Amino acid sequence: MKAIISLLLISAMVFSMIEAVPVEEGLQLFEGERGCLPHNRFCNALSGPRCCSGLRCKELSIWDSRCLG
């Protein structure tokens, strides 16, 4: 019984620490992991169908993709 209570308390502590990260910071980390490059309006083909700025990623060739409206 003590083990179950300890496990529940530890789970609650971990969840509260995860929730402490701001949503905006989490989104910035996610966009960085996708390989988005908003400064030159290029997008990584592996980043998915959307660019960081909300524009669509258009594949111009196998090696070149750009963020287009």
Curated annotation (Swiss-Prot):
Gene Ontology molecular-function annotations: toxin activity
Keyword Cell membrane set for record: no
Entry's Gene Ontology cellular component terms: extracellular region
Range of residues in the leader sequence: 1-20
Prosegment location in residue numbers: 21-34
Record's keyword terms, sorted: Amidation, Disulfide bond, Knottin, Neurotoxin, Secreted, Signal, Toxin
Organs and tissues of expression: Expressed by the venom gland.
Key word Signal present: yes
Taxonomic superkingdom: Eukaryota
Modified residues annotated as Leucine amide in this record: L68
Disulphide-bonded residues: C36-C52, C43-C57, C51-C67
Annotated compartments: Secreted
Recorded family membership: Belongs to the neurotoxin 01 (U2-agtx) family.
Domain commentary: The presence of a 'disulfide through disulfide knot' structurally defines this protein as a knottin.
Protein's job: Insect active toxin causing rapid but reversible paralysis in crickets. No activity shown in mammals. Does not show effect on mammalian voltage-gated calcium channels.
Protein's UniProt name: U2-agatoxin-Ao1g
Organism: Agelena orientalis (Funnel-web spider)
